[in-house]
């Protein structure tokens, strides 16, 4: 009862704070408009001056608390009410809250109370704390699920100090918030969504969702026949490697890769740069595409900063009405108290310096059919089989690579960087990379992807490109196996 009262009190305080900040922004906007009028009497001007003097401390307080760029519009009372209602739905009472040095708040939420379980298809769903089976490859065995679920011995980030032919030095992985503490057993680590997060979004209804895909293709018909869903005429550009459709190979039940982590520059506030893997099935030209995605992204609009962050996404209808980023809608069931999806990753790579990468694995549990995600040796959670149509069976294609959005600001190509912001030819410690590409087969075994089994695609190689290669030391576990370098600076003399 005491815990419930405390949770209710904290929730009310957050609500009052959000309303104060939103109302302050609205009042400030109205005052700014008033300053442009020249028909005020002297007394009116004095009155308005007093009003500004009263509001100024509130504005300063709002800026200090939020530490966010000013918005171009004021929220109406109706929008404010919708935002608060949405926040009440997705931010669940926390057993413990941890303030991160990057400005985030991580809530330790009781696993059974998480927002992910509120999907209508998951009514009565019993949380699977660990998968019945994990992928295997020869002598390789995935770290014990129970130990990973308990949060012990995490080594999620690799530091590579020399070149791809030498052994890597393993370092303990950190998300930035870990410096502030850890969540207790029985809870899951959830990044708290704020009013500022939602005010940056174009609409409350589509908060946390990707834009709907444009059916217009930007590639020729021959390539479109096998093209991945990301190849579209909606301003998105990519440098990716992808497997052939399942008509040319065996069905796929998962994928794995180790991804170099950078902090690319983003030119526009609504731009982004990401590096991820896609697990796909369904029609690329219809509305039944199923997709599971995971990687790192820099998105000022979604997170309010330029830090690289672990992210996930899912859809079962080609990004129309289902799915979302991270835990911003019901569906993904989190099991980890150590990894917070949407939290920033630290440290990151530097040109000519230490290179940091992270390993992601997504696979379908052959017994229950759920699609699990691991980050390094940590189980993060799963997408229940009920969420999907085509992926309830298997995947038909896997993709790995980078993506940016080009809104052509000022009529020229965006200068938003992909990967490290360097072209593939610059190689190790300059260009970003994906290494040790693997897929999971019907026997739940990891298999190295042959170099000739993947194709590459870059819509505009003068802006962002990709080069694949193979390191034959991969079989010993010391090399990079099938890998590729990718990325670029965007706008440059050859990319006007």
Provide a role label for each language-model segment.
Residues 1-63, 71-76:
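Classical eukaryotic N-terminal signal peptides for Sec-dependent ER targeting/secretion
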Residues 54-496:
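Exposed, interaction-prone regions of secreted/extracellular proteins
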């Amino acid at each position: 009862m005491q815990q419930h009262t405390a949770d209710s009190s904290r929730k009310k305080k957050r609500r009052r704070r959000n309303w104060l900040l939103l109302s302050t922004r609205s009042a400030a906007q109205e005052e700014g408009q008033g300053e442009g009028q020249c028909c005020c009497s002297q007394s009116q001007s004095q009155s308005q001056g007093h009003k500004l003097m009263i509001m100024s401390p509130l504005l300063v307080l709002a800026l200090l608390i939020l530490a966010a760029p000013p918005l171009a519009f004021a929220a109406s009372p109706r929008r404010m009410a919708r935002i608060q209602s949405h926040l009440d739905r997705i931010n669940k009472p926390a057993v413990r809250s941890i303030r991160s040095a990057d400005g985030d708040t991580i809530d330790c939420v009781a696993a059974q109370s998480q927002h992910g379980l509120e999907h209508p298809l998951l009514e009565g769903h019993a949380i699977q704390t660990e998968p019945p089976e994990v992928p295997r490859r020869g002598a390789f065995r995935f770290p014990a699920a129970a130990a990973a679920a308990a949060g012990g011995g995490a080594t999620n980030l690799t530091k590579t100090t020399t070149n791809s032919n030498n052994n890597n030095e393993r370092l303990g992985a950190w998300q930035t918030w870990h410096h502030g503490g850890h969540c207790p057993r029985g809870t899951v680590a959830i990044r708290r969504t704020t009013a500022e997060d939602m005010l940056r979004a174009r609409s409350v209804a589509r908060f946390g969702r990707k834009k709907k895909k444009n059916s217009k293709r930007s590639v020729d018909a021959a390539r479109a026949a096998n093209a991945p869903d990301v190849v579209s005429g909606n301003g998105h550009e990519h440098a990716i490697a992808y497997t052939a459709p399942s008509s040319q190979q065996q069905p796929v039940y998962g994928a794995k890769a180790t991804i170099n982590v950078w902090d690319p520059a983003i030119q526009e506030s609504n731009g982004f740069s990401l590096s991820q893997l896609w697990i796909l099935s369904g029609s690329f030209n219809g509305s039944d595409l199923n997709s599971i995605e995971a990687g790192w992204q820099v998105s000022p609009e979604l997170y309010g900063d330029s830090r690289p962050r672990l992210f996930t996404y899912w859809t079962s209808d080609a990004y129309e009405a289902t799915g979302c980023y991270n835990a911003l809608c019901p569906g993904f069931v989190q099991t980890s108290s150590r990894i917070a999806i949407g939290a920033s990753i630290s440290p990151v790579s530097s040109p000519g310096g230490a290179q940091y990468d992270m390993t992601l694995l997504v696979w379908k549990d052959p017994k229950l059919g759920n699609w699990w995600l691991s980050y390094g040796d940590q189980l993060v959670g799963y997408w229940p089989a009920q969420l999907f149509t085509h992926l309830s069976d298997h995947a038909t294609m896997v993709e790995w690579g980078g993506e940016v959005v080009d809104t052509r600001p000022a009529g020229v190509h965006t200068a938003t960087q992909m990967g490290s912001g360097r072209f593939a030819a610059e190689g190790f410690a300059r260009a970003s990379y994906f290494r040790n590409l693997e897929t999971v087969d019907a026997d739940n075994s990891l298999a190295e992807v042959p170099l000739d089994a993947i194709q590459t695609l870059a819509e505009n190689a003068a802006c962002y490109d990709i080069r694949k290669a193979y390191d034959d030391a991969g079989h010993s576990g010391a090399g990079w196996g099938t890998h590729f370098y990718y990325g670029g600076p965007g706008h440059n003399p050859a990319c006007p």
